[in-house]
Amino acid sequence: MYTERYKRAAGLLLSVFLWGKGTAQQPLRFSMETLHDSLSWLCLLPADRTEGEPAGNGRKPAGMKAVARWRLDYPVYRLATGDVDGDGKDEALVGVIKPTRFYPQPARRLFLFKQVNGKIRPMWMGSRLGGILCDFRFVRPYVRTLQSTTDGKYVVADYAWDDFGLTFVRFLTGAVSRKEAAEKFASNEPEEAF
């Protein structure tokens, strides 16, 4: 029924399909390659070749070839990684400084990127959180933010992923001084809501 030629073609297609699935599942990690102050590349690198290297150090190790890259045409002030959406893979949390349509003044924004079959895909490109974003970090399972208020005070708030974007979970401080908020923001102790 099938000729030898069709059997070989089917076998070749099957092996290419299975090989592609295997390579897409290799462990990858995010890194940042900064070319100058307003041009950076978010990179996916093989995770097994540079164990122990901190995420977001700003440089790719010499000789490392990125599996995927995403161009960021804005100044980047922070890269953090963590499993934001609970799927078992780390996402990249990238802090950029840029204007938006509704907030034309350049300010700190938060972008989330995920890995999809060895590619970088935008997950959420937020224009604003509750307050004026100063800094952020990932504290499983939350994105912890340090934000300023319009009256010069500071708050620390946790956000969690909710299918479309980040949703507010709790305040860890009320409106306090920058020093007090920064201490709470940097703390690794179990946190209680304010």
What feature does the model see in each segment?
Residues 1-2, 15, 83-86:
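A general, composition-driven signal for non-globular sequence regions
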Residues 11-17:
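Bacterial N-terminal signal peptides
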Residues 21-194:
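Beta-propeller-forming repeat regions
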Residues 2-10:
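Bacterial N-terminal signal peptides that target proteins for export
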